[in-house]
Amino acid sequence: MDDRLSWKFHIQGLSKKLSRTIGILYRLRKMNSPKSILTSIYFALFQSQISYGLLAWGTACNDLIDKIFFLQKRAVRIISNAGFNDHTQPLFKKLSILNIRDIFKHQIASFMYEYESGNLPTIFDSFFKRVNESIIRD
């Protein structure tokens, strides 16, 4: 986060890291590496970078999230050996990869489940209040 309370600087740095991973995937695909290896590398090097801290920066403006999503689509096309203009939604499904927005939703759902189960520190109680048996964020 920068001095203007924006995630732009963080996402630019993340984009550079993800671009390097895309280069690795591309070179490995050119060496005829199996799709299973490419997928494993994607999860180890790409998705792990996306997931780290996503609960904090996942609410950044759509323009910034779209930059990451664009890189994610490139990675999925490389793994699938698909063309530049091929639609990626079926590729995501075939590879069992969630897009960045779905990863964010999953992390929120997991966090709220852990909160409701009482598995989180009590400090998080001050973040939420109950209204008619529902939880809303302060």
Show where each model-derived region lies.
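Hydrophobic/basic alpha-helical segments
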Residues: 1-138
